Amino acid sequence: MRHPEHQYLDLLAQVLEKGDQRIDRTGVGTRALFGAMIRFDLSDGRVPILTTKRVYWKTAVKEMLWFLTGQTNIQALLKENVRIWSDWPLARYRKETGDSISQEDFEKRVVEDNAFATRWGDLGPVYGKQWRRWLGADGREYDQIAELVQTLKSNPASRRMLFHAWNPPELGAMALPPCHMVYQYHVTSSGKLNCILYQRSCDLLLGAAFNYAAASALQLMLAQQADLTPGEFIWFGGDVHLYLNHLDQAREQISRAPRPFPTMRLTRRPDSIDGYRISDFEVDGYEPHAAIKADVAV
């Protein structure tokens, strides 16, 4: 049986060979395809943490747990040594103040100075805000995650089990509009929880691996809370691209042979979706190839 990671490697190769090349918002330039799908089966306990390069899965899961808190300030992430969101507020700070502060010093100030963090560490109404506190036209805040969990428990045959973060009136205030936009869930008659993730924009070299790991972790949490078992994770990409400064790294990754996916399990069951901690996740059998370094386009 062909290793499921080959779906990802094949997509890398397709973008390299057939992608439409153009200059993008960041100025770096991309090679892109429009429309892609990958399916992973989580029912045997194995999760798609890519093996053809080391993926720092704890960072991805910590980010997902942060989203679930509804927070939008990077201070909490930095206290967990998660630095993947620092580029955007740092760029804003440098632009607005003219200060050429280093990223290390900027992050240190965000962690240690609450007033500075409040002024410069907030990302605007990004994922967590929309997932947990979507502001309706009636002035009420809607908790999409709580509604999803309740529906999974009370009406698992529903076709309305989804949440998303694309809130047009608030897009302009976000540091970055949502890339992984829509999560939809489906429960089979045998009690398996399936997930579709639609991602409008996918940085295929850097972003996709995190999205696969984080979405799988969320699927495990939701399944546990609703007394279900994980089923399929199905990923759809809209604009699937490689930045032009990532092409050599993509070729290196394609040259590597996949190794067995690791297993992920939850070591305890919290009372609610809000109770999970990074220590609740145990990954076994992860023996990837070496990490591949690449710069983030801001």
UniProtKB/Swiss-Prot annotation:
**Where is this protein chiefly located?**
cytoplasm
Residues of the active site are: C179 (nucleophile)
Where on the tree of life does the source sit, at the highest rank? Bacteria
Q: Which CDD domains match?
A: TS_Pyrimidine_HMase
Residues that hold dUMP according to the record: R25, R159, R160, R200, S201, C202, D203, N211, H241, L242, Y243
Assembly and partners are described as: Homodimer.
The record ties this protein, via HAMAP family, to:
Thymidy_synth_bact
Q: What is this protein called?
A: Thymidylate synthase
Q: Please name the taxonomic classification of the source.
A: Bacteria, Pseudomonadati, Pseudomonadota, Alphaproteobacteria, Hyphomicrobiales
* Gene that this sequence comes from: thyA
